Each structure stands twice: as structure tokens, then as C-alpha cells.
Amino acid sequence: VLSPADKTNIKSTWDKIGGHAGDYGGEALDRTFQSFPTTKTYFPHFDLSPGSAQVKAHGKKVADALTTAVAHLDDLPGALSALSDLHAYKLRVDPVNFKLLSHCLLVTLACHHPTEFTPAVHASLDKFFTAVSTVLTSKYR
């Protein structure tokens, strides 16, 4: 459960990210593919070379979904229901991959915002990404 302090940290961080969310999403996805090569199996039709336009475009989709989640912190299941359906029923993404991407998102944000990435912000973002991952995998059962 996200506390009021977590919600404040998440919204504040997302405000600071601003127009870079799509870039950071692409970078985190790149980082995921490089660090955890098995994640590439879901994208056989993509050019997965670092910085590819397809990876950047999908990273923007990830960032857009997270921006939606930030705007609906009190109703993540409602805000992400369609995305949960897509990943569970059509794409059948292994749930562990959400954890791997979450880790890479944290690393990417820490690299770009080292001063703002305090232990409290880190913990809040980790809880947020875990909550989003939980929603996205909730329909697997």
C-alpha cells in the first residue's frame, strides 16, 4: 500500500522527469534487454540494438502507462485493467519480467536524477513499480 508520503514522492519525481519519461522508458528497456537477454524473446520482430527506434517507441509506451498510473495512484487496477488484460491474455509475458524492468527503471532514474534519488524516493518508487507489476500480473491467476 502506498502511503501519503510515497504518493508525494512518486508524483514529485514524475513531475521532475517531465518530458523525459519516454526517453527514460526507452533507456530502461534497453538496459533490461542488455542485462537480462531472455527478455528479448518477447520482441522477435524488433530491432533490439541499443537505441533502436522500435525500443524507444516501446519505451515511450511503458512511460505513458506509468504516467497514467501516477495519475491514478488510488486506482491502479482500474487505470491499468486493459494493459493487464493485454499482458496476461494476449502477450503472455512472464511476470518476472516486470520485476526486471522495474529494477532497470530504478537504475535509469537514479542515473539521471542522482540528487533527487534519496533513499525515501527510491523506496517509494520501488513500492510504486511493485504495485504496478502486481496489477499487471493480477489476471494471470
Curated annotation (Swiss-Prot):
Q: Please report the stretch or stretches of sequence annotated as the Globin domain.
A: 1-141
Tell me which GO cellular component terms the UniProt record holds.
blood microparticle; haptoglobin-hemoglobin complex; hemoglobin complex
Q: Which domain of life is it from?
A: Eukaryota
**Residue numbers bearing the N6-succinyllysine modification:** K7, K11, K16, K40
Q: Which residues carry this modification: Phosphoserine?
A: S3, S35, S49, S102, S124, S138
Residue numbers carrying N6-acetyllysine: K16
The annotated subunit structure for this chain is: Heterotetramer of two alpha chains and two beta chains.
What is the name listed in the Swiss-Prot or TrEMBL entry for this protein? Answer: Hemoglobin subunit alpha
At the highest ranks, the source species' classification is:
Eukaryota, Metazoa, Chordata, Craniata, Vertebrata
